[in-house]
């Protein structure tokens, strides 16, 4: 009898606790064991993202406005939800009337005698939610759930291993950038390739915070310009704007893109190579050479990204290139440089980095790759924060490789450089095309109030209209500078 009474009392206690819990909706709670947050409001099978400090909800839509927006609505079953003074029906299609981006709507959620008023805004940008039970560090990676709600595609949800991204200076910024890998389980070593934004599948991805770029455009438009140059070997990333939430905190505007790795470049040959320059030092600028080759993944300001350093280290092809550039006689340089590098690719790279004044990309912000040992090196740019006049108007820039190419003129380098500039000015570098690339990206992030959120979250005073207008004036002026230079080459 006592045992029976004990169980009855225990059940009543649980019921009482559950009833107390249902007296109000708990908003800012930790994720469950599956790294999921509790339901607040779901529209057409996509959870609205919630910011606890601002009491706001956000939801992505494809168009700037929708008349008679009919949507399947879900919320916690013991609550009442009022949208714009209209009571919503749970687990049914509701007509929300006309909705538009950049307009605030009131949501009132009531449970018994408690109520909370939230502000709902619609955005044209995809929304990424990172849900984690632990802090995200520089390294090692932490486990998180990655959820992305698109305006016009199905939701993607997956476990990821995530860490902060960048060098020492970047890691000190208040707004963090992240690198992450998709996982097929909760084990951090079980990586799996994934496709986002209909891009090719990749295991490794980047969320770029763009904190030091007041235009919030430089990396995206530079990548678009580089990939618009006609040619077979213009490898690069395809950044896409997203809004990022870390649990229940809006982090602002980010660019989501693939990482430059063997998957992106389709490096299948066991003799393929991928090196990444990581420092503004003599070796990176091809100012010095060395035959002291280590058996580790880092050497003289470079990192071997492929082959996997745990399996094989191969610095000799890079050492041979450096020795040719730094140590060779003029005659040997003229005869051999065309067998070491893809001249056409390096010409396009030189024109591109001078067009956008990407001085950093002379050294640390580059990748060198080749598909096999008999192939020639091609060059890949990345990270364009310091470009498009961010350091003021700059003259035509060089490193030691380009100085020797210009001075010694192997393979008729200077004429090919000038002819290529004239050709690219017809289409890829046409003023209207470059301005169109800027305007398209600018329009994407000015349709919603995302910069207001950025300014409030990170205590900045960015005016996108002014920044983007100045950027377009700068590119027009830069084209004139480049035209004058190549006319006299």
What annotation goes with each model-predicted range?
Residues 159-160, 167-169, 173, 307-362, ...:
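Middle-to-C-terminal accessory/interaction subdomains
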Residues 184-187, 193-195, 199-211, 232-237, ...:
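Internal "kinase-insert"/substrate-recognition segments embedded within catalytic cores
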Residues 16-19:
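C-terminal motif of bacterial Sec signal peptides marking the signal peptidase cleavage site
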Residues 79-81, 229-243, 358:
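Short, well-structured beta-strand/strand-turn elements
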Residues 178-181, 203-209, 216, 243-245, ...:
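Structural recognition of the beta-strand scaffold that forms the well-ordered cores
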Residues 21-125:
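Beta-rich interaction/scaffold domains
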